[in-house]
Design a protein with these regions (language model features):
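Sec-dependent, cleavable N-terminal signal peptides
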Residues: 1-25, 452
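Alpha-helical hydrophobic membrane-insertion segments
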Residues: 6, 19, 428-434
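ATP/adenylate-binding site constellation spanning eukaryotic-like Ser/Thr protein kinases
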Residues: 10, 111, 438
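Sec-dependent signal peptide cleavage junction
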Residues: 15-28, 421-428, 448
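Surface-exposed repetitive/solenoidal architectures
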Residues: 24-419
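A cross-kingdom C-terminal cell-surface attachment/processing module
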Residues: 430-450
Length: 452
């Protein structure tokens, strides 16, 4: 009997050991919580798909993916849940060359959240709206705390290191990218490919992000975002940016939003034709929509560019600016600092704004035209010898018809500004333009007039 008992005990122990071994071979990597029910999965794809219509997905450990990834969250079935990476790393996200739109770990994020996850060794390729974490954000979705540690992200249009695009309403914050980003057509951004369209009562935000990956496009290109109607603040770019309408932070800021307290140290290069517009240390081109785009930009406001710093060289084609390459019509340009020692273009260049001009009012919804508020707290250390162009200036080059630039120093509380004028003129023009200055205690109004 003792021998039989010993044999039975040995068998039980062996079975127990075998059960533990089987469990370790199929380890759970994520869990999904919906309501009061939590389910663990050995497949990240299964966990994410289980929460597409709502719920929380959490990583339980680092994950190494094998094979090709199939994007979760499509146009017909977007991802509406929350994915919390808990600081873990997903290695080997591989999406091979294809003609699909909305490509990434998650294709379309509809009001959901992706946060606190790292990606290593990514290889993500699609057609349009391509990003490592999310292809497109809609309906107020949020992406935060995502780190892309290296690899490549590529496509035709709207390609971002973290997010391909934001449409009208959404937030990307505290993300970093070190992957190379390439758009074979246009709209490549180190963090977000494009943040575009406007809707009444809705806002887009890109804040506190860092890009360290080279960004290249055949068209609009930005170190943080390419085409933007978002509020872009507190971001840093250190990498080279090459494209047309190219900026160290924003390629083209259009119709709406603000660009504040960003820093660029990456070299900015316009690779377009000789007449290509816009190369800026912070923004390549600032402008407003045309009548044909009224449906895309039904809400407009004067764009503010304040508190930004650039130290990266700027090489343009038609124009280049240490902060903004080209400004159309209206903007508020205050308290920006350029320390780049090389700013060059064929025609127009300056330490802060390379080319300010007015164009015909784009649309009835566009803000009041022909007013540029340019603060005397904008500074540039670049000398005229370090600025190369046919028409150049230490701070801003004005170019156009009946242009008024208002320099507004901060008034002291003890002595509010008085609005009387003492006319005094001087010739401060370069090239074919002259500048007439009207001095007052409120500042200086500048008007560009063509030489005769």
């Amino acid at each position: 009997m003792k021998k039989l008992a010993a044999i039975i005990l040995a068998l039980v122990m062996a079975l127990g050991v075998t059960t533990i071994s089987w469990a370790s071979e199929v380890e759970n990597v994520a869990q999904t919580t919906k309501g009061n029910t939590t389910t663990q999965y050995s497949s990240l794809a299964e966990a994410l798909n289980a929460a597409k219509d709502g719920g929380m997905v959490e990583l339980l450990k680092n994950v190494t993916l094998t094979g090709n990834w199939t994007t979760v969250g499509t146009e017909s079935e977007p991802f509406k849940g929350t994915f919390d990476g808990k600081g873990y790393t997903i290695t080997g996200l591989n999406i091979p060359t294809n003609d699909n739109e909305y490509v990434g770990l998650i294709g379309i994020l509809h009001g959901g959240t992706v946060k606190n996850v790292k990606f290593a060794s990514v290889s993500v390729t699609g057609k349009n709206d391509v990003g490592t974490a999310v292809g497109r954000i809609i309906n107020g979705g949020t992406v935060s705390g995502v780190q892309v540690l290296g690899g490549t992200v590529s496509g035709a249009k709207r390609v971002g290191g973290v997010v391909g695009s934001i449409k009208a309403n959404g937030t990307v914050s505290d993300c970093t990218n070190a992957a190379g980003v390439t758009a074979n057509d246009r709209n490549a951004g180190g963090i977000v490919g494009s943040a575009y369209y406007t809707e009444t009562g809705k806002q887009m935000y890109i804040t506190g992000c860092v890009n360290n990956g080279a960004v290249t496009a055949s068209g609009v290109c930005g170190g943080i975002v390419s085409l933007s109607a978002a509020n872009v603040s507190g971001n840093t770019n250190t990498a080279a940016v090459k494209g047309t309408e190219v900026g160290g932070i924003v390629g083209e800021q259009k119709s709406y939003g603000s660009v504040t307290n960003n820093t660029n140290s990456g070299a900015v290069t316009n690779t377009g034709g000789n007449a290509a517009y816009g190369a800026g240390g912070i923004i390549g081109w600032l402008r407003y929509h045309e009548t044909s785009e009224a449906n895309a930009y039904p809400v407009s406001e004067i764009i503010s560019v304040t508190g930004n710093k650039n130290s990266g060289s700027v090489t343009g084609k038609n124009d280049a600016g240490g902060i903004v390459g080209v400004v159309y019509n209206s903007a508020v340009i205050m308290n920006n600092k350029n320390t780049a020692t090389s700013i060059s273009a064929a025609t127009f260049a300056a330490g802060i704004v390379g080319n300010y001009q007015t164009v015909e009012t784009p649309a009835a919804e566009a803000p009041a035209q022909n007013k540029l508020t340019f603060g005397d707290d904008n500074t540039s250390t670049a000398t005229l010898e370090q600025i190369t162009a046919q028409c150049k200036d230490r701070l801003i080059y004005t170019n156009g018809n009946a242009i008024e630039i208002v320099e507004v120093p901060d008034p002291t509380p003890e002595q509010p500004p008085h609005y009387y004028y003492h006319p005094k003129t001087f010739d401060a023009g370069v090239g074919i333009y002259a500048v007439t200055a009207v001095l007052s205690v409120t500042g200086m109004a500048w008007t560009a007039k063509k030489r005769h």
